[in-house]
Amino acid sequence: MPFAVERDLARRALDTARTRGATYADARFVRRQVEDAVVKNGHVDTIDRSDTFGFGVRVVADGAWGFAASQVVTADEADRVAALAVEIAKASAVCKTAEVRLAPVAPATGAFRSPVVQDPFALALEDRVGLLVAADAAMRSVKGPRTTRANYEIWREEKLFLSSEGADCEQTIVETGCGISAEAVGDGELQIRSYPAAGGRTQNQAGWEFVEKWDLVGNAPRIAEEAVALLTAKPCPQDVRTTVVLGDAQLMLQVHESCGHPIELDRALGWEAAYAGTSFLTPERLGTFRYGSDTVSIRIDSTTPGGLGTFGWDDEGVPASEGWAVKDGVFVGYLMSRETAAALGKPSNGTMRADGWARLPLIRMTNVSLMPGDAGSLADLIADTDDGIYMETNRSWSIDDKRLNFQFGTQLGREIRKGTLGDLVRNPTYTGITPEFWGSCDAVCSASEWRMWGTPNCGKGQPGQIGHTGHGAAPARFRNVRVGVVR
């Protein structure tokens, strides 16, 4: 969208904030359009559309933060909101424990647009929903599933950011997601299979071409058949230790929960504890702590094509960047804001994002990815494994408030016997302590198996915000892992 009027209003808000006593101010105008559709058991269950537009002003005054927002986009409202933000900052300063300090950054200027081949909003609604109807019908062609679902989400966000330091940039982010799931019930068991990922959806920064590449209709019968077959599959062994090979879609969530959240510097500093606590990766461990084996390298990269954490600039006007969280097993990097980076005497790597115009930006995962190794294909990795369990597609998880002790359950498991995949395993689970678990990783598949996954539902903050994060991974092997529920 053209931002000519909004740019003038942003400048006005910044001027008002400075006049009222702000030493720093920024203004964000955000328009977000979202459409979700679900087909369930042969019927169109929901088609939801939303369109929101508004602006927020963030300031520092008397050494403290203030923020205010509105969906009334007028000159008078720009003045009112800016003045209110300064008033809130000055009130907050009464009980501040330290002055806000910001790491320096060059003023952001320019424009960024998600690369899109086929605009999902330009496709006829009948065609979008028609694909879901066909995929759902293909699952229902299999005898046995109790419930079938197919869904998509299309998402567009247009943002304008100006700051009192001279930043002036705009961005258009387009995302598309899709998936299918089947549930089967029998003998007190509920089994679920979803594709391509847990929750029946994965999402990337892309157009409708992203949906088409997953071939939902072609994969639908297999997913339904697996859900039914799991009802009579072997149960997961109870409380034993064995080798575990995790599929890349499961590793995506493992990275998210046991690396992505603990490297958020606000958690590590103890400034943030909402939605699952602080972090065991405290600053004195930076650069020396053994997070995993030499095989494990995890990258922070907001430039990765297709990633939900890809952008031109974060919501503080810091440019996209790339670096390491873990390099050859050693913890070396955080996700940082300008304020938290200043606390460590470092430049920000640009990870502050807000959930729309009405919320303050928070440190959020960008694209935090397990980098590929040299173990070849998944078939090669299985062939190199004498005994163990292959697990894929998350079903449940639990992790403590330091991000150390965890348990994950997956939808599907398969025995590994003498280098081949064997019988199905139902209700597979594994548990561990984060550095011990990553320390047991002795193989990661090669780049040909690496894939970028998306998590469009990451919660953080109070009031709560939903973030969109990207996680690349290839299948990997872990030795001496505790599997099965402890009885």
Language model regions located:
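N-terminal small-residue-enriched
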Residues: 1-487
